[in-house]
A protein has these predicted regions:
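Acidic/polar-rich alpha-helix caps and helix-coil junctions
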Residues: 1-49, 66-233
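Active-site-adjacent substrate-recognition loops and nearby beta-strands
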Residues: 50-64
């Protein structure tokens, strides 16, 4: 419903403009309070969840994927580069689920792109980049990066192959919302790509059907005619 996204996101953006520089870093790395343009955040009460402790203990053994690092073509000129990981490829960004104004900018860029309004799509894509990259070169239809054929996401939310513009929007979303609980949902709504990870010498494959959870056996037994989700029969 791309048309309805636009007025709502634009209204929120007027009230909660983008941060940049030190203000942005402070907002991202704050563990205790809800900063300025954050609408909703996880871990409102300190100590309410041990997920951060679990993640911290796993960081040395799970380096940041090189394909993600390669998205930062401007390197240190992008403030998110040093904020997200260190030279050992260890994650350094504070783990927090958030809904904040930067996501509204990304939603606007994507919505306008889906409506074939490339001028406004570029406007909002460049708005975000101008607040994160110094010095910054605006994207145009002519200088957009080529679509990476090896990227995990290869189709958009409508199932169409990614254009250069949509791929650039997806890349900015991945960089901006890293460690904020967004990536799984992006994979789910953009083609449900299959991938694998290794742990303890074993290969674990995420198949398309796994983006939907199975229905509990008790519910299947209690509700006559209820069908198990595909892949879990």
């Amino acid at each position: 419903d791309w048309e309805n996204v636009i007025p709502l996101a634009e209204e929120l953006l007027k009230d909660f403009p983008l941060l940049q520089g030190d203000d942005y870093v402070k907002m991202i790395q704050d563990k205790a309070t809800t900063q300025s343009n954050v609408f909703i955040r996880s871990y409102v009460f300190q100590g309410a969840d041990n997920s951060e402790t679990q993640v911290s203990s796993a960081i040395p053994y799970r380096p940041v994927n090189k394909s993600f690092i390669d998205l930062f073509t401007e390197k240190e000129a992008d403030i998110r580069y040093a904020l997200s990981f260190n030279k050992k490829r260890e994650e350094t960004k504070v783990l927090r689920g958030r809904v904040r104004c930067a996501e509204m900018v990304l939603m606007l860029a994507e919505s306008y792109a889906q409506l074939s309004d490339t001028e406004n799509a570029l406007k909002y894509l460049n708005l975000l980049r101008s607040h994160r990259i110094t010095p910054y070169i605006p994207y145009t239809l002519e200088n957009l990066p080529e679509v990476n054929p090896d990227a995990l996401i290869r189709v958009d939310a409508t199932g169409k192959p990614l254009t250069r513009l949509m791929a650039a929007i997806m890349n900015e979303r991945q960089k901006e919302l890293f460690m904020e609980g967004d990536r799984w949902f992006e994979l789910k709504r953009n083609g449900r790509p299959e991938f694998w990870v290794a742990k303890d010498g074993q290969k674990y494959v995420c198949q398309k059907f796994m983006y939907t959870a199975p229905i509990h056996r008790n519910d299947l037994e209690l509700v006559p005619g209820m069908q198990q989700n595909p892949g879990y029969e």
